[in-house]
Amino acid sequence: KFSTLSSSYDNLVTLLPNVLGNTLPSNLKKLGTFNLVGKTELTRTFIDADFTMATALGKVKSNFVMHSIDFIDKASYVGNVVLDNFDLGTFVSEKDLGKISLNLDIDGIGFTEKYLNTQIKGAISQMDYNNYSYHNLEVNGNFKMPIYQGKVSINDPNLNLTFDGLVDWT
């Protein structure tokens, strides 16, 4: 258990190789040095976390429980994630995507295309995509790579849209 932590991906893997060595997704390196404040309980297979984290890519606030982290690609999770001006494009290596601010409830499994299957519901207050900053998005659906099925609504000054259907990202 810990309540305050200042570290990086490389430091964590070096300090706790038997606990975290093969469980942290490598894209977490992109967060750089981070400062985490809150309550976190961590074992080889389980995380219970309620924290706020400042990173090189932006702020993250989260309250979640994650099981089966010993096989992180298929880990299960449930909770809430808040991103504030977070550079999602850099984090996921997608050049058309930029910064995002959101508040989402999540319930699912997996972090890779092979295993990802997640229910998401919440608000995206701002999202930079293709050099435009969209505002006032709402989502409620299931994301199972490469398919999103559910509702999306956008109430942006340049786009008013309500969608209920399926999107194939291939």
Regions found by a protein language model. Name each.
Residues K1-T170:
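Interface amphipathic segments
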